[in-house]
């Protein structure tokens, strides 16, 4: 039977001495994963900007003047070309995001065709398209979609300070529709929205106490975009962020914990500590939605320093020429990639 985390138990994890917490998280990580491998995903915007929602952190909202260039739906061939390059660069999962409140029925054949084509390449697929009903979720699942991303963002109590155009319960209903369809769930949150420690505790409790824990949990650090209401929020203290990663690993031991948006603001030492705390997945590529992502070459150099191997590569250290070949093949158009915090 899955453990149900209580408020007191979760608070106690946050109160643990830092190194004791790190030790426990690393122990839990090693029970369930190879500590020297990392899962790599690439995220592509298939429709950018003009979103009707009012998420206060998001440059894709039509309500804020952020200078984001609006783009229509990409052609299928453009998407397939990007997916091939992502696979050649070491990604095992191709994620696609559209700036919608929810997909329309007219969009479903387009989405289903993309999923089937990318699956033929041998990659896992993930989409983030906004709210889904059960019929839409079933169609995506039948097309072969492996994961659906729908973040909770923050705690139920703090949520209305961030978003008013979609309720917390609607998010939970979408996650239920995704799970019921047979797809895997990708759901996490954003740190740095102005939330208190209690909100971080409640967010991790909500995620870990879902009927089945998410297979993938992206932990985003707020990317402060000029023009959004959160452009001047305080920076997140790195050790607070590392602590959240560690607690997430302990509470969701079999989930992939992903370093997502905001990673470009972290130095190598902070990222290494996050990996030590149990993070074992990243978004790799030029851009995440609308914010910078660390350059591919730098990522691969960091992997080499830490002896981390992409999950779909051989489980031995890559040789120098293998790293160079991956770097060479990773040149993808930067204007197609965007920020995971907005999904």
UniProtKB/Swiss-Prot annotation:
GO MF annotation terms: 2 iron, 2 sulfur cluster binding; 4 iron, 4 sulfur cluster binding; biotin synthase activity; iron ion binding
Database matches in InterPro entries: Aldolase_TIM, BATS_dom, Biotin_synth/BioAB, Biotin_synthase, Elp3/MiaA/NifB-like_rSAM, rSAM
Domain Radical SAM core intervals: 36-254
Domain of life: Bacteria
A Pfam family recorded for this sequence: Radical_SAM
Enzyme nomenclature, EC number: 2.8.1.6
Catalytic activity: (4R,5S)-dethiobiotin + (sulfur carrier)-SH + 2 reduced [2Fe-2S]-[ferredoxin] + 2 S-adenosyl-L-methionine = (sulfur carrier)-H + biotin + 2 5'-deoxyadenosine + 2 L-methionine + 2 oxidized [2Fe-2S]-[ferredoxin]
Residues at which [2Fe-2S] cluster binds: 95, 126, 186, 258
Binding, [4Fe-4S] cluster: 51, 55, 58
Function: Catalyzes the conversion of dethiobiotin (DTB) to biotin by the insertion of a sulfur atom into dethiobiotin via a radical-based mechanism.
Alphabetical list of NCBIfam families matching this protein: bioB
Assembly and oligomerization: Homodimer.
Annotated protein name in UniProt: Biotin synthase
Provenance organism: Buchnera aphidicola subsp. Acyrthosiphon pisum (strain Tuc7)
